[in-house]
């Protein structure tokens, strides 16, 4: 994993290419990412994905984007972000990036590329049916990947079959009548110098499927108690992932409340 340079609130830091910005901030000792809108209470990283309620930042590099969870930004060289308290600023320059759309008909659509989704894709692909499997994470595997555990190579290889379309960094945003799904694929935000001029930044997928398999998994929620938004309070799944996958320790001493294995991991 190569080291890249990024800027946060005007200060230059270093991190590992491809890791979430939240992991890089924690590795550099940044506990307070932003402040609340009205009372200016300090807030840090709580989660790992779109469930992140506190660590919202503004991207100033590239096409620019406001109100993005730091947990969903892949680190690339030259990334420029700043903390965000309240409403973000829309970019005032013209967005020169390309955006496109595509329409697909498929036998089976699988939403979620965790262990369950991968096994479903393998079984359906072996039957000869056409498959689209999409997932909003940076890589397949779900919780198994989060804990840096190995995934059976046969499952990964099943995604390479001719009748399988595999889409990572793709979020299904709507499920409508007659098995019609709309999804957004983020195609270039995780790239830097490798971007081709004709490559679109995002692609909207309009998918009609004969069958849909929901393998979306679940995410944790913060317990309700006073001051539960203070820096240092984190979901056990997030803390375990930062430690095992990104080698970032989130605390030395602490209290762990858990109802599953993540608290012990």
Predicted regions and their residues:
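Residues forming the flavin
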Residues: 1-265
């Amino acid at each position: 994993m190569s080291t890249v340079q990024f800027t946060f609130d005007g200060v230059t830091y270093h991190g590992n290419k491809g890791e979430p910005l939240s992991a890089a901030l924690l590795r550099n000792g940044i506990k307070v990412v932003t402040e609340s809108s009205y009372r200016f209470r300090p807030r840090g990283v709580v989660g790992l994905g779109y469930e992140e309620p506190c660590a919202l930042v503004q991207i100033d590099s590239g096409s620019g984007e406001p109100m993005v969870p730091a947990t969903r930004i892949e680190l690339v060289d030259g990334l420029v972000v700043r903390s965000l308290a309240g409403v973000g600023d829309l970019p005032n320059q013209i967005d020169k990036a390309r955006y496109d759309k595509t329409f697909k008909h498929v036998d089976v659509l699988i939403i979620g590329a965790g262990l369950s989704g991968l096994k479903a894709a393998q079984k359906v692909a072996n039957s000869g049916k056409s498959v689209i499997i999409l997932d909003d994470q940076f890589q397949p595997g779900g919780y198994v990947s989060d804990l840096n555990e190995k995934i059976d190579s046969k499952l990964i290889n099943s995604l390479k079959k001719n009748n399988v379309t595999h889409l990572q960094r793709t979020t299904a945003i709507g499920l409508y009548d007659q098995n019609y799904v709309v999804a957004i694929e983020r195609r270039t935000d995780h790239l830097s110098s490798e971007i081709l001029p004709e490559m679109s930044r995002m692609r909207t997928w309009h998918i009609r499927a004969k069958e849909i398999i929901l393998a979306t998994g679940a995410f944790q929620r913060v317990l309700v108690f006073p001051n539960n938004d203070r820096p240092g309070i984190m979901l056990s799944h997030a803390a375990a992932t930062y430690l095992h996958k990104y080698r970032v320790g989130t605390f030395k001493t602490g209290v762990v409340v858990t109802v599953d294995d993540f608290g012990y991991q």
